Amino acid sequence: MSLIECKNINRCFGSGENRVHILKDISLSIEKGDFVAIIGQSGSGKSTLMNILGCLDTAGSGSYRIDGIETAKMQPDELAALRRERFGFIFQRYNLLSSLTARDNVALPAVYMGMGGKERSARADKLLQDLGLASKEGNKPGELSGGQQQRVSIARALMNGGEIIFADEPTGALDTASGKNVMEIIRRLHEAGHTVIMVTHDPGIAANANRVIEIRDGEIISDTSKNPEIPASNVGRIREKASWSFYYDQFVEAFRMSVQAVLAHKMRSLLTMLGIIIGIASVVSVVALGNGSQKKILEDISSMGTNTISIFPGRGFGDRRSGKIKTLTIDDAKIIAKQSYVASATPMTSSGGTLTYRNTDLTASLYGVGEQYFDVRGLKLETGRLFDENDVKEDAQVVVIDQNVKDKLFADSDPLGKTILFRKRPLTVIGVMKKDENAFGNSDVLMLWSPYTTVMHQITGESHTNSITVKIKDNANTRVAEKGLAELLKARHGTEDFFMNNSDSIRQMVESTTGTMKLLISSIALISLVVGGIGVMNIMLVSVTERTKEIGIRMAIGARRGNILQQFLIEAVLICIIGGLVGVGLSAAVSLVFNHFVTDFPMDISAASVIGAVACSTGIGIAFGFMPANKAAKLNPIDALAQD
């Protein structure tokens, strides 16, 4: 069985009136270890035939078999495997990647074979040394002469074994001396057992082969052999290694090429990233503002008491009849405090009036509360003490004042132990509260706190309370507790003449509202991300067009479609991730400036928003980079190689 066997191969280009029949019923067979020269003038079809034999192109009709296997039935990746494992190409124009060194160009086919990095470099250096380029491993193609570049191309063809060498006009771009040197190398390869198929228009070059096939106008007109003896082929084939390093090395290579592509066009890459940068910075900043404002509001709510339920007379805030309802009593508070899910219950009554100290009269509000009130409301003592259970039982004439009262009446003295008059009733100051920075409402109001028994019995003379503040135990559900309290009070009062304000409900409402606002504004900011993604897609399409030749070279040496897809997809994702990280950094800088000048609430950048931003930019890279990458992966190798 012949190594290569073609029967009735036809290839046409164009369609309709422009249809050109390049190859016409070509039939031939090539044995293992043969040295065949295909000769003909320009346009004769010799290069087209070699491209079909090298699986860079496909025949329009006919049969082409390698070791008896029909190539027409092979998938693109199966054809890539043939090029990778059995073929080696020597091109007239060398087709080296200008961004890689001689060593890296030679080693590139082995990347797609899964060969380890050290083994790959050692083999590449050995091949370069054998071809007289031992001192040129680190040189890039632009630093080498034409003859040296062609020898690098030959070394690359041998990297994976090169059982079958395809040489397309190997001396066409070389001077006479370099051409002779290259032909001597090719003859030695044949003598070593490689099957060599060479295309040339020069009869003198063709004379080096054992067999010469002449083509004219797409047809074989002669097939002569001058030496029927074919040396035994002992060329070892390097097998693909499917290990973790196989995938790792291919990813590293794709990543390295992506970085080089990004750095090669710095300004273009920066402008491409700009949409991503603005979009990510906008989203992260909006979320940070939302987090900061939500945190501030929730802190304010917490200052009013956590896990608390406040009970008021009436049907709701603004109920005009609430002042006439006097059914909320101290006994209600005592019964509520005994419930299993209640930590404490403190009644509250209030009174407005004139506060007098020496010759100063001020308008203030006095609140009658229980000893637990301050803990429930999260109020902190600055100096002195709070009243206790005994003070409540004994109707003690003591009072705790806020910072506003202290500043107005005791700016230059210690208020503790001083007696003040409220509605002409003497009260002894026993404590001063810290200023409540998180409190709602007017911060200039003068506030006093005394035992509710003192206020009710000695000042207002009323037996009912304005409200009851209930602290729910940490392990209890506030909604269930609210329902239980409602049933308890309805049973006591015989009607629902009260309403409740659950701090947990307020918290949930704030979280829901701020979450909705963040989502709304983030959705607007996401538009710039979509615009940025379109920019990435556009620039990647340009990149594919610019690097079509590179894609063709990689396919010729055995890259799968997946390898090409991976490389360009990584490039798109890399641009987006860098843009995302810069966007996060920009948002962090804005946050620092904002927090320096604005003290009402901070910009709070969370780890979740940063992770989400990077994930979002990665997703955009994948989504908008897939189409250009897929376009690159589906290019026909010979069409890609034909691009300049």
Swiss-Prot record:
Main location: membrane
Subunit structure, as described in the record: Homodimer.
Signal peptide positions (record): none
Main function: Non-canonical ABC transporter that contains transmembrane domains (TMD), which form a pore in the inner membrane, and an ATP-binding domain (NBD), which is responsible for energy generation. Confers resistance against macrolides.
Topological relation to the membrane, as annotated: Multi-pass membrane protein
E.C. code: 7.6.2.-
PROSITE patterns according to UniProt: ABC_TRANSPORTER_1, ABC_TRANSPORTER_2, MACB
Chain ranges of the ABC transporter domain: 4-242
Positions contributing to ATP binding: G40, Q41, S42, G43, S44, G45, K46, S47
Record-annotated membrane-spanning stretches: 270-290, 524-544, 574-594, 607-627
UniProt-listed GO biological process terms: response to antibiotic
One Gene Ontology molecular-function label: transmembrane transporter activity
Record GO cellular component, one term: plasma membrane
Compartments, as annotated in UniProt: Cell inner membrane
InterPro entries recorded: AAA+_ATPase, ABC3_permease_C, ABC_transporter-like_ATP-bd, ABC_transporter-like_CS, MacB-like_ATP-bd, MacB_PCD, Macrolide_Exporter_MacB, P-loop_NTPase
Entry keyword set: Antibiotic resistance, ATP-binding, Cell inner membrane, Cell membrane, Membrane, Nucleotide-binding, Translocase, Transmembrane, Transmembrane helix, Transport
Name used for this protein in its record: Macrolide export ATP-binding/permease protein MacB
Family statement: Belongs to the ABC transporter superfamily. Macrolide exporter (TC 3.A.1.122) family.
CDD domains per record: ABC_MJ0796_LolCDE_FtsE
